[in-house]
Amino acid sequence: MIRALFVLFSLNAFPSLADTFDFEVLLNGKPIGHHKITLSVDERGHQVVQGEADYRVKLLGITFFAYQHQHREIWDDNCLQSLSTSTQSNGELAQVTLTSSPEGYALTTLKEPKALTLDEQPCLWSYAYWRKDFTSQRQLMNGQTGQMSPVSFERRPPIEANPLNSGPVPEPSLGEALESAGFRYRLVTDDQTINVDYSPAGQWVGLQVDLAPNRVLTYRLRKML
């Protein structure tokens, strides 16, 4: 159910290098957990990203779905240098490790190792919604599976200008969007569409994705630390 999210800007938006995003996670509008992502800088000046997600879907006190995901990324020169993730989805374990060298990338999952040359992948990106130039990417790596997917982005009307049950809203100019409640980008993959929301200042503040018919997963920023 959640795998699709992780498959889940050329704006002047780039968070400071000591930020924490604390998201409430909702399924069909009901809280099911959280996802906290912390950005810092190491002694080499590389950006370090660490995150932890925990979702639990319950009915009458019984847990029907449990999901835990931990991830750590290191970025340098606007490219992903290394990544390690561990995911438990209803008890099923998935792990991904990515390292880089002058020759290229080495990608390892529980299924198989894979080498990627610089000709094949000169600069890898994960689903790093918070990074400047995110919406200019044309391929992203799923941090849960290691799968590479072609992607495209479409700028949508600002968040408040696109209410539910309303008719079509004219596409705003960049200036109008800057003065409004924020930006929305539609991220499209081969099998999924994710709506990603940003504040007027370009801060990532949430996302929304249809996991299945009548199942909508939402990230809502609780606070920025």
Which stretches of residues belong to each language-model region?
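Sec-dependent signal peptide recognition
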Residues: 1-8
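Gly/Pro-enriched, hydrophobic low-complexity segments
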Residues: 50-52, 66, 180-225
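Glycine-centered positions within short beta-strands or beta-hairpins
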Residues: 29, 175-177, 202
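A structural detector for beta-sheet-dominated domains
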Residues: 26-28, 40-42, 52, 76, ...
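N-terminal mature ectodomain segment of secretory-pathway/periplasmic proteins
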Residues: 19-101
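N-terminal signal peptide c-region/cleavage motif recognized by signal peptidases
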Residues: 10-15
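Solvent-exposed helix/loop surface patches that form functional interfaces
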Residues: 84-193, 206-208, 214
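Absolute protein N-terminus
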Residues: 1, 17-19
